[in-house]
Amino acid sequence: MFEPLAVKLRPNNIDEVIGQKHLLGENKILRNITENGKIFSMILYGKPGIGKTTIALAIVKQLGLKCRTLNAVINNKKDFDIAIEEAKMYKGLVIIMDEIHRLNKDKQDLLLPYLESGLIVLIGMTTSNPYHKINPAIRSRCQILSLIHISEPTRL
């Protein structure tokens, strides 16, 4: 099966990620997650193509955690129900959710009790300001991390 080049070259751990040193550098928040093995719910906020999904996948892969990737727009309630059942079966699951700013109220209400209990760890990604677009109940249970533009000297 055809695999896009971006997928083939995607980093397997945070050491392979270029840029975002304010989050991935020594003693920084995302570096500490991988070193301590303790993950928490977060929202990664930044422009398209800046590495939000790549960072989320690298963290999960590096920690060897079970995860499910969902899209707030494309996936329906049944997909969310399946993810919750997986979380119960595995006694925990990381949900990587793209376009979290477009998550409707029903899906938010469905996820909230599992976020609160710790059964689900949510890594949401958004290009929109999370303070304006994401439900305060979800937002209050997540650390909001802003990704910045990669400067020229950092690029390969």
Residue ranges, per PLM feature:
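Residue-level detector of conserved catalytic or cofactor/ligand-binding positions
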Residues: 146-156
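A short helix-turn-beta junction within AAA+ P-loop NTPase domains corresponding to the substrate/partner-engaging
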Residues: 137-148
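Loop/turn-to-beta-strand initiation segments
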Residues: 40, 91-94, 118-123
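Conserved catalytic/switch belt of AAA+ P-loop NTPases
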Residues: 106-129, 136-137
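Walker B catalytic acidic pair
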Residues: 98-99
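Short glycine-rich substrate-engagement loop in P-loop NTPases that contacts/grips substrate
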Residues: 26, 67-92
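Walker A/P-loop
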Residues: 34-69, 86, 112
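Pre-Walker A (pre-P-loop) alpha-helix and adjacent loop at the N terminus of AAA/AAA+ ATPase modules
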Residues: 2-41
